[in-house]
Amino acid sequence: MIQEASFIMLMGGDPFKQKEMCEKLGIIEDLKSFDGIMMGFSAGAMLMSKYIIITPCSLEYPEFRIENGLDFDNLSIYPHNNTSNIEYPDVLSVGEETYKKQDLIKVANQYGKFYLLQDNLREDGLTDVSIIKSINGVIEYYYEFDGKIWVVNHDIELLDKKINKVVI
């Protein structure tokens, strides 16, 4: 059934439950070999990643949890890192979740670089959007309004929108 589709959208929720459900349905290999367009939002983007990454950030996730994802194009996504700052703060609180810069860097040192994406709902009702498009290893970055993408490696650096594609 999956191979007959031309488009698959993986939605949000708990990325580990989403992966478990796909395993129980026996569709992991079908998703990995899918030849159409696949889009992931939130947990869906995390499932498409090389690694599903959660740092200790809340009562729901008090410890590091990192599992293999579908590994499309060897990149990993960690969504919902919403801040208006240009410099990534040492501690970022988003709702009931708290992200520590040192925890994010620790993961990158062990598992390789990954991307933090912003999808901030603004006071004016608009949403700051950031998107990564990857086709066969060719990566493009898209932003709307004040969307941001950070690269986590040995530090956390904001991608320079001047040298990356900026459209939506």
Question: Can you say where each PLM-predicted feature lies in the sequence?
Answer:
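Portal/gating segments that form or line small-molecule/metal binding sites
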Residues: 1-17
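Catalytic nucleophile loop
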Residues: 11, 34-51
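Residues that form generic nucleotide/phosphate-binding pockets
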Residues: 21, 30, 106-110
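C-terminal and late-domain segments of enzyme folds
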Residues: 7, 54-168
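Glycine/threonine-rich flexible loop motifs
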Residues: 15-24, 88-89
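Short capping loops/turns at secondary-structure boundaries
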Residues: 20-24, 41, 70, 97
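Glycine-rich nucleotide phosphate-binding loop and flanking beta-alpha elements
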Residues: 15-17, 45-47, 84, 132
